[in-house]
Amino acid sequence: MSDIISIKDIDLAKKKVFIRCDFNVPQDDFLNITDDRRIRSAIPTIRYCLDNGCSVILASHLGRPKEISSKYSLEPVAKRLARLLDKEIIMAKDVIGEDAKTKAMNLKAGEILLLENLRFEKGETKNDENLAKELASMVQVYINDAFGVCHRAHSSVEAITKFFDEKHKGAGFLLQKEIDFASNLIKHPARPFVAVVGGSKVSGKLQALTNLLPKVDKLIIGGGMAFTFLKALGYDIGNSLLEEELLEEANKILTKGKNLGVKIYLPVDVVAAPACSQDAPMKFVPVQEIPNGWMGLDIGPASVRLFKEVISDAQTIWWNGPMGVFEIDKFSKGSIKMSHYISEGHATSVVGGGDTADVVARAGDADEMTFISTGGGASLELIEGKELPGVKALRSKENE
C-alpha cells in the first residue's frame, strides 16, 4: 500500500499538526475508561510529531451523541492520555468555537491540544465541508491515524483532506500498519489460510464471507450467525437466532465453498438454554437436538475440539466475531477457548472487530496475537475489498 502518503513522507519540522485519532473507547457508568487500547495505539504517531518539534492538535469522536452532553466529553481521554504520555494535555471546551480556536492559535511547539468530541458538531457525520475548512484552518499538516472511522466519509476523515496538498497530509503509523496488514492478508497469506467468522448476524458479514471464500483454504462459522447456515442445511434450531430472509444467501455461500474446494465448518454441538441469561439452566446438545423453545448461545465442547483441529495446521488465521454470547460468563467458554487455541499456534493471527478484541483481552491472549485491529467495520470492509473513503483521500495522485 505504498501509494498512501505516509507521515514519514512529510516535512513536519516545527509545524502545527492535526491528528485525527480514534479515541472511541468503552467507559463504565462512572465514565471511567475500561479499555485504553485505542488511546495507546495513537501514541507512536503523537510522539513522532512531538519529536519533530510540532505543536499537536488531536481530534476524535466518542460514541454517538444526539446533543452536547458531558457523558460524551473527551475529558476522561485527556486525563488518560496525559498519564500515558506523562505530559499535560490542553483540553478545548468545544470543537471549532472560540475556546478551541484561541487555544489552537496560542499552541506552542511541544504542546498538545485535544478538541472536544467531534460529533458535538452536527456537520461531522455529514462530511460538511464548512466544518472541515474550520478544522483545517487551525493547522498546516493533516494526519489520519483513525483506522476505525476510515470507512466513514466524515468531515474530519474525508472532507478535511481537500484543504491539504500531498505534501501536507498523510497516514499515521497505526493507520499504515492496519492497511498493510489487511492488504497482505488478502493478497499474500501464508497457507493454509483459515478464516474464523462469528458474531450474531450473517447480514453484517455476508459481503466479507463472499469475498473471503476464493481466498481462504478453510472457513469456520460460529456465533449466532451459524444458526442461519444450520437452518439452511435443514436442521431444527429451536429458538436460536435466525435471519430467515438470508437462508438463500447462506445456501449460496455453502454451495460456492463446495465449488471452490473450500471446507466450511459449522458447530456440531452447542450450549443450549431456554433464555439468554446467567441464571438460565443450560446443557450441551448436538446441533440436531436443540430442545423446542431453547436456543444455542455458545459452541459446545465437541465444536471446540473440531475447530481446534481445523486451525492446527493453519499458517494464517483471520478471526472476526465471537463464538457465542461472550458477555454472559456461562456462554463465553467457546470464544475464550478459541482465543487460547488461535494465540497458542504458530500461525500469523489477525483479530478484527471490537467484540473479538474484547474476548482476546478477557482471555489474556492479547500479547500472543500477531495483530489486533482497532477497527471493526473498517477492517471488515477492507477484507470485503472495498476502498475506504478515509484511505482513498490519502492516496498519492501519481499512483491512482
From Swiss-Prot:
Matching InterPro entries: Phosphoglycerate_kinase, Phosphoglycerate_kinase_CS, Phosphoglycerate_kinase_N, Phosphoglycerate_kinase_sf
EC assignment: 2.7.2.3
SUPFAM superfamilies registered for this protein in UniProt: Phosphoglycerate kinase
Cell compartments where the protein resides: Cytoplasm
CDD domains tied to this protein: Phosphoglycerate_kinase
A Pfam family it matches: PGK
Gene Ontology cellular component terms for the protein in this record: cytosol
Catalytic activity: (2R)-3-phosphoglycerate + ATP = (2R)-3-phospho-glyceroyl phosphate + ADP
Paired cysteines (S-S): none
Similarity comment: family membership: Belongs to the phosphoglycerate kinase family.
This protein's name: Phosphoglycerate kinase
Gene assigned in the entry: pgk
